[in-house]
Amino acid sequence: MTEVALSLDVSRFLRYLGVERQLSPITLQNYQRQLDAIIALAGETGLKSWQQCDAAIVRSFAVRSRRKGLGPASLALRLSALRSFFDWLVSQGELKANPAKGVSAPKAPRHLPKNIDVDDVNRLLDIDLNDPLAVRDRAMLEVMYGAGLRLSELVGLDIKHLDLDTGEVWVMGKGSKERRLPIGRNAVTWIEHWLDLRGLFASDEEALFLSKLGKRISARNVQKRFAEWGIKQGLNSHVHPHKLRHSFATHMLESSGDLRGVQELLGHANLSTTQIYTHLDFQHLASVYDAAHPRAKRGK
């Protein structure tokens, strides 16, 4: 079987996806792009028919793709397309088993979240309160850092979600999971300051944080305002809401060491999601060790 014949089988598969599965043209183009790349790799390995393909050859496709600069996420898509194609060939009786079934792409490296150190957080929060919107922004910053909220949770807060007597808020997290969180004395103070001014913008809106038009503030507006305050306050790194959430988690873990507690505060379903912050904590401790411990100093 020649490369042309390999392509004919792929064309039959794409026709099946378009006619019987009724996949969108964009999805079909993505399948074709990935499978065309596989056919090119098959030509490099001397593969003459799909029936000759085994797990070792599929792994060689993966290795060659990586050498050509394909990232882990893109390689996972390529192998997924190949598995679907082979499943179809099995259903047509043209293959006995799917040779790509047990072959997976290497996992993409998990990037450690960046955080803002405590001094910079304090500098960020010490903003010039020359207008009501600045008071609102200070309250949002205090709540975001004080409770480690997601951006969607912050903009979704209603006044009814507050219990300022206990210093707590109710938030609706991912998967419609509700949780009750302490927000800290500073956040309570600045929410109260904002509530004193909030009536200048709207009186019948349920949302806690409003835009200058009196409607619930948008996530994009929050991102824009936080970035602007980061620049005004002279922070070297870009300030965005998720970075404040990361900073909350890192600083809490450094202070308490209570991974389970931080998991509950962040609303993570799995502890493994929270454990990434232990790497940040270790990096901090390692830098302190390298700077201070006599045995860590080189050449002495």
UniProtKB/Swiss-Prot annotation:
Localization (cell): Cytoplasm
Regulation: FtsK may regulate the catalytic switch between XerC and XerD in the heterotetrameric complex during the two steps of the recombination process.
Gene3D superfamilies per record: 1.10.150.130, Intergrase catalytic core
Key words, A-Z: Cell cycle, Cell division, Chromosome partition, Cytoplasm, DNA integration, DNA recombination, DNA-binding
GO MF terms held by the record: DNA binding; tyrosine-based site-specific recombinase activity
GO cellular component: cytoplasm
Principal cellular location given in the protein's record: cytoplasm
Name recorded for this polypeptide: Tyrosine recombinase XerC
Organism, as annotated: Salmonella typhi
